[in-house]
Curated annotation (Swiss-Prot):
Position of the signal peptide: none
Keywords per UniProt: GTP-binding, Nucleotide-binding, Repeat, Ribosome biogenesis
Nucleotide-binding listed as a keyword: yes
Gene name tied to this protein: der
Gene Ontology molecular functions: GTP binding
Bias-annotated ranges (Basic residues): 472-492
CDD domains for this protein: EngA1, EngA2
Name of the molecule in the record: GTPase Der
Record note on quaternary structure: Associates with the 50S ribosomal subunit.
Binding site for GTP 2: 207-214, 259-263, 324-327
GO BP term (any one): ribosome biogenesis
């Protein structure tokens, strides 16, 4: 997983010019007029062998009102919060301004890593400005000329050790997903890996700040519990907290909880802020095995809640929906029926996922949440034998044969499970491109019902008959060689 670099600084110091040079395209507007970049622009950057995400921000303006400049400033501060590294650019020809001093102080407080760059530093005329940049207290400035491409080697030297550190931490925190299976029955025994101290269950709790997410996490951790952390997470917005979550029957789950700023309340700002808020949730989801989507019982299933739940499904993570503040709900049964109906209607792709009511304030319902998380994790690891699948497929075909589009009969010949975490299945058939979406949904819903896989994402790939054996060349191959099973048409 690559890091994210935010280029920040006051207007017209050359941020967009450097952004365009790193991305290799003119994606950002460049002009001599200050404040041309009014939005956040994100691109895939390349610097020698480094690959990372770069964000071009609006200029940091020393304003506090609700004018356009004020919104640009808040948007930039939001980008600083979500970035792993901030490249703070100053103009070496102009020198350090009072605005630079103010926002250097902001960056010291808000940013995890700050790299200082003095741009427009070509020629002796910039020497005084480069020396003056030391007064910011952010270390030695890099001499850059974004327009001419000078100083990029020095930037690479600064970023390389940080990139290595993020890659190492990402490897430690990344969950094992899309696990390939082969024909050996031994894989069935290994499919469900129980959490251990070295490989704890990774859970992300996501939701709006006023949904009670922090209170719930504190209840799970326990006020007096000695934690092996907090550890810095992959982003400054995410920290992972380790604990042993004791269940109602005394069963203990070694667990790492990814706590993140999550999905913030809709601000009076443009859509980019909302997009960045969901971006925080994305980081938490990517490092989780089970995602707990926390809702407020008073205002459940808002647009942001639906987006993050759908995101977890698309990322292939197990999902548990928890409804908080249940202790102050008066008509509990009617509300529960309403929640279940809304869940089935708004999130059909997660049909059957656990929906648990809790009170983060009192701790009631945590036992149910504990069971639901374990159950979701078990289903996410589910393994079905090839013999069972093909007997099941024969019954499904007999009950509802596939259609014959344009008179072409579709034959579904063979089925096997190719992956787990989440479960993924390959069907060998004729005319895989002709199988309609409705028939794929019929098969996925049948798998979910008949093999007891409620709520978990299920992947289904239709493959042609050119390679009659879906395990060919794969039995002793590394997982990366299994992409041939997922390059075909995917139906969820």
């Amino acid at each position: 997983m690559s890091f994210t670099l935010a280029i920040v600084g006051r207007p017209n110091v050359g941020k967009s010019t450097l952004f365009n040079r790193l991305v290799g395209k003119r994606l950002a507007l460049v002009d001599d007029q200050p404040g041309v970049t009014r939005d956040l622009r994100e691109g895939a950057a390349r610097l020698a062998d480094l690959r990372f995400t770069v964000i071009d921000t609006a200029g940091l303006e020393d304003v506090t009102d609700d004018s356009l400049q004020g919104r640009m400033r808040r948007l930039t501060e939001r980008a600083v919060d979500m970035a792993d590294i901030c490249l703070f650019m100053v103009d070496a020809r102009v020198g350090i301004t009072p605005t630079d001093l103010v926002f250097a102080d902001i960056l010291r407080k808000r940013a995890g890593h700050v790299v200082l760059a003095a741009n427009k530093a070509e020629g002796a005329a910039a020497d005084a400005g480069v020396i003056e940049a030391y007064s910011l207290g952010l270390g030695e400035p890099i001499r850059l000329s974004a327009e001419h491409g000078e100083g990029l080697n020095d930037l690479y030297t600064h970023l390389m050790p940080l990139a290595d550190a993020y890659a190492e931490r990402a490897a430690e925190d990344a969950p094992e997903t899309d696990v390939a299976l082969d024909e050996d029955s031994g894989d069935m025994e290994a499919a469900l890996r129980m959490p251990t101290a070295n490989k704890p269950l990774q859970v992300a709790v996501v939701g709006r700040p006023n949904a009670g997410k922090s209170t719930l996490v504190n209840q799970i951790l326990g006020e007096d519990r000695l934690l092996t952390g907090p550890e810095a997470g992959i982003t400054r917005d995410a920290i992972s907290l380790r604990t042993d979550w004791v269940g109602p029957e005394g069963d203990v789950i070694p667990m790492r909880i990814f706590d993140t700023a999550g999905m913030r309340k809709k601000a009076k700002v443009q859509e980019k802020l909302e997009k960045l808020s969901v971006g925080d949730g994305l980081r938490a989801v990517k490092f989780a095995e089970v995602v707990v989507v926390l809702l407020d019982a008073a205002i459940p299933f808002e647009q942001q809640d639906l987006r993050i739940a759908d995101l977890a499904e698309r990322e292939g993570r197990a999902v548990v929906v928890a409804v908080n503040k249940w202790d102050i709900e008066e008509n509990k049964q009617a509300k529960l029926n309403e929640l279940r109906e809304s869940f089935e209607r708004l999130l059909p792709q997660l049909r059957g996922a656990p929906l648990v009511t809790v009170s983060a304030r009192t701790g009631r319902g945590l036992d149910r949440l504990h069971k639901a998380v374990l159950r979701a994790y078990e289903v996410w690891n589910r393994r079905v034998t090839t013999a069972q699948l093909n007997r099941w497929l024969a019954g499904m075909l007999e009950a509802h044969p596939p259609p014959a589009p344009q008179g072409k009969r579709i034959k579904l010949r063979y089925m096997t499970q190719a992956k787990t975490r989440p479960p993924g299945f390959v069907v060998m058939c004729s005319h895989p491109d002709k199988v309609p979406d409705s028939y794929n949904r019929y098969l996925v819903n049948g798998l979910r019902l008949d093999f007891d896989m409620p709520g978990t994402p299920i992947r289904l790939w239709m493959r042609g008959q050119n390679d009659a054996n879906p395990y060919k060349g794969r039995k002793k191959a590394p997982p990366s060689k299994l992409r041939k099973h997922t390059d075909g048409r995917r139906k969820d």
